[in-house]
Amino acid sequence: MTTIDLNCDLGESFGAYKMGNDDKILPFVSSINVACGFHAGDPSVMRQTVEKAMQHNVAIGAHPGFPDLIGFGRRNMNVSASEIYDYVLYQIGALDAFVKAAGGKMQHVKPHGALYNMAATNPEIADAIAKAIYHINPSLLLYGLANSEAFIQAAEKYNITLVQEAFADRTYKQDGTLTSRTEENALIKNEEEAIKQVLQMVKEGYVNSVNGEKVAVQAQTICLHGDGEKAVQFAKRIYRTFEHNGISICAPK
């Protein structure tokens, strides 16, 4: 039986601001990426998100991003590899404290937004992220963009397991990278098209690029975004589509 992980970015609320549909999405995913306070989230939200994930038996990962609350971590920052190492180490450590306090165990690390996209094409940034993971806990998995040589090489260098990720509702360029969110066609807004893309990736191992060419994608985890208007409905659709097609949903081991 084909097996796939469904992951979602959660814990993005902070202070008086509520983001996402965390409670309603948790039953339909197998792993979550928890914002660690730099691009979103706050200490109370981190604790609450960890506790809810454990109640649903969902694998927990840190979702470190750039210190850019106003830009939601989606703007590139011109910082050194050393600074990125510090940012990532700090955020992993913060979430790990909440996970341990709740009696759980962190499974993975997935960079957020601009940090993720920059790491996918910049070996120096990917190396800094992998090094931070290695120094805090080398058994943590690294979620990174499928086919990214930067992520692959960094994981190999530090002997970290890379879980190759694809996106349900994002379009792809010919080189296998994601279309920038600054472009109008970055998101797939039609549910049927997104479902078709996910099944192609999981069952057939490819995705159609924005240019119409087939791009090989060997995904081990699929990302759902939890902050969209129809996020919960979409999560249910993918979950049930996988069940109907005999695809087992579970976190990576």
Curated annotation (Swiss-Prot):
Cystine pairings recorded for this chain: none
TM annotation in the entry: none
The reaction(s) this protein catalyses: 5-oxo-L-proline + ATP + 2 H2O = L-glutamate + ADP + phosphate + H(+)
One GO MF term: ATP binding
EC number: 3.5.2.9
Entry keywords, A to Z: ATP-binding, Hydrolase, Nucleotide-binding
Pfam families: LamB_YcsF
Example GO biological process: carbohydrate metabolic process
NCBIfam families linked to this entry: PRK05406.1-2, PRK05406.1-3, PRK05406.1-5
Family: Belongs to the LamB/PxpA family.
General function of this protein: Catalyzes the cleavage of 5-oxoproline to form L-glutamate coupled to the hydrolysis of ATP to ADP and inorganic phosphate.
Subunit structure: Forms a complex composed of PxpA, PxpB and PxpC.
Name the record gives this protein: 5-oxoprolinase subunit A
